[in-house]
Amino acid sequence: VWYAIPDADNAACREAYGLGACWGVVAEKGRLILFGRYPFDEQWRPLVASSVLVVLLAASCLKTFWRPALIGAWVAVYAFFFALMLGGFAGLTYVETARWGGLPLTLLLASVSLVVAFPLAILLALGRQSNLPAIRTLCVIFVEFVRGVPLISVLFMASFILPLFMPQGTQIDVLVRVLIGMTLFTAAYLAEVIRGGLQALPKGQVEAAHSLGLTYWQIQRMIVLPQALRLVVPAIV
């Protein structure tokens, strides 16, 4: 890396053979790698949108910012991200989602799938331990089926197979379909991690909470989930 050749000159790359990497393609196609097929003159928009999202991701890792206002910040940043990337107002050129790519799309897919999948994973983990056979069976089938399918297959089905089963004239944007597929896939894996934390808690705590007259959701919110989630933080990270 230290002796890498950033030029696209074949002669310079041959001279440096065995000393460093030839990164001519990186220098030549850097913008394509970072921003995909987004219009060249408008690439400041994905740069700004990605920077704001990265700053929020970094802030979310600091315990100082763990307040209810952080949820509002996430909603505001996502709204800003989509508005800036799509455009179509205030003189901004409209750019369809099919032309999004590179770093902005990667950050969006990763962050949205994790943020949305986490509460869904909690519900799936609780459902797998439910006393109601119907709920428990449905959660088990969903989790085991999704975990048994590779992510690339989920993305392929969301992108190409799902539209074939849609009613004629009905169309869902490919970005939305991919987000749904990745969210469900992530939720299935997180559900198993969270279920491990739920099983690690002593049953005596739940029995004591029942004896105090607490409802099911009060027990989960105040006793079970805070401890279970704390136990599985290393596995989630």
Task: Report residues per predicted region.
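Transmembrane alpha-helices and adjacent helix-loop boundaries
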Residues: 1-237
